[in-house]
A protein has these predicted regions:
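DNA polymerase sliding clamps and clamp-related checkpoint/processivity subunits
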Residues: 1-26, 31-161, 167-264
Length: 264
């Protein structure tokens, strides 16, 4: 029997991070094109409402094994179906993704657990999706903030119980979250901390107010990425989308961009 030839074959031991990533992505993108090239894996896509932009980048050098049979391979995946296959994946499993040369319409998913001496293989039918040519011009942000991901998640969840929108404001050395609903309003102010709390990575104009109003329902979905990393980065600029950056363990990062709400 001849040895199988692969046009795609990648392997990682960071299976739990990959599972959390797919679980979060399926809430934002129903389907997505995963682009594989020599540098790694990339997803650049907008949600159906064209309010959210997802930019995922996982670096080839951070995988245990990464080999392509072509310069570039685009793989169309239904995120919900992918999650159904990997949601029971054990944290100690090694995850392999592969496409065989003679079966390019199917993504192979292999889960191996050395401790349990088990191997599970799935075959996921791929989709022929339209390729969006999304270009993001570089932007300079007045404020770049880092804060614990669990704190951001809690603020967004709690405020979503009161209101639909949240105002995020950077002023001086403080970060302010505000919301106003039908029966109550809330304001939470966070001061800079040098050890483990909120801090400014960049604060070009501390005397100026940098702020935006954003839909909480999207930020609550974003916060499903919380378990990926202990800290997030917020990129804030007046009259510009909010960018939230999560590290995907040590594989790479995902940036979620949310357009501001226009108050009428």
């Amino acid at each position: 029997m001849s040895e199988k030839r692969y046009i795609l074959n990648v392997k990682t031991i960071q299976s739990s991070a990959f599972r959390v990533l797919v679980e979060a992505l399926k809430e934002i993108l129903t389907d997505a094109n995963f682009e594989f090239d020599a540098n790694g894996i990339k997803v650049m896509a907008m949600d159906s409402s064209h309010t959210v932009l997802v930019h995922l980048k996982l670096l080839a050098k951070n995988f245990e094994f990464y080999k392509l049979g072509r310069e570039k391979i685009t793989v169309g995946i239904n995120m919900i179906n992918l999650f159904k296959l990997i949601k029971t994946m054990d944290n100690n499993d090694t995850l392999s993704l592969f496409i065989e040369e003679d079966n390019e319409s199917v993504l192979g998913i292999k889960l191996e657990n050395i401790e349990k001496n088990t191997r599970t293989k799935y075959s996921l039918n791929l989709m022929d999706l339209h390729e969006d040519n999304i270009h993001c011009p570089p932007a300079e942000f007045e404020s770049v903030i880092t804060m614990p991901s669990v704190d951001f998640q809690k603020i967004c969840r709690d405020m979503h119980n009161l209101a639909d929108n949240i105002e995020i404001q950077s002023l001086g050395s403080q970060l302010v979250f505000r919301c106003s609903g039908d029966f109550a309003s809330r304001e939470t102010t966070i001061g800079e901390m040098s050890d483990g709390g909120m801090s400014f990575l960049k604060n070009d104009s501390p005397d100026d107010i940098v702020q935006g109003i954003f839909a909480l329902k999207h930020l609550v979905l974003f916060s499903k990425c919380t378990n990926l990393c202990s800290n997030i980065e917020l990129y804030l600029k007046n009259d510009y989308p909010l960018i939230i950056k999560y590290s995907v363990a040590s594989l790479g990062d995902i940036k979620l961009c949310l357009a501001p709400r226009v108050e009428t």
